[in-house]
Amino acid sequence: MLDALADHDVSGEQLRIADFDVKPGVEKDMGDGDEWPGIRAKILAADILVLATPTWMGHMSSIAQRVLERLDAELSETDDAGRPILAGKVAVAVVLGNEDGAHAITADLFQGLGDVGYSTPSQGGLYWNGEAMHTVDYNDLPETPEKVAQTTATLARNTAHLAKLLRAQPYPAP
């Protein structure tokens, strides 16, 4: 996804939340070694959030759920004009797995991300589902399936477009 966004002059950084000690909770800093504050700073600095998750038993991972929970702290945060602090930023969902659930996961992610202020572009979700009960992972595929490549290109184009529009013309202040 980051490579596809780069085609639209969008640069980014990949953070694998599983590699960090992100404490459970709904505060900006849960203390005691919580690494969320550093991640939060990067999220706030970014115009685009790509939230990717595997499908586990038909649901998003507990780590993706934790990201949503930690973003809950932003509900009461506003900018100088009184807008939600994440309003004007764009979020997209990427879901991979060997079982059903991609549409439901995308819907859950979009609801949570929208609640904290993110906007989602047209066709803002990307997913790949392998065969149920098989062991082939997306990373094991010899090449990216054509439909996934097409959807990735569309998602990147629409995401970059919306982010540029919102940066140039923010949502009105209350």
PLM regions and their residue ranges:
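Short, local alpha-helical segments
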Residues: 90-94, 136-142
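A short acidic, often aromatic-flanked loop/helix-cap motif at beta-alpha or helix-coil junctions
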Residues: 20-23, 128-135
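N-terminal beta1-alpha1-beta2 submodule of the flavodoxin-like/Rossmannoid cofactor-binding fold
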Residues: 1-81, 139-174
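Short, glycine-/small-residue-rich phosphate/pyrophosphate-handling segment
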Residues: 80-131, 147-150
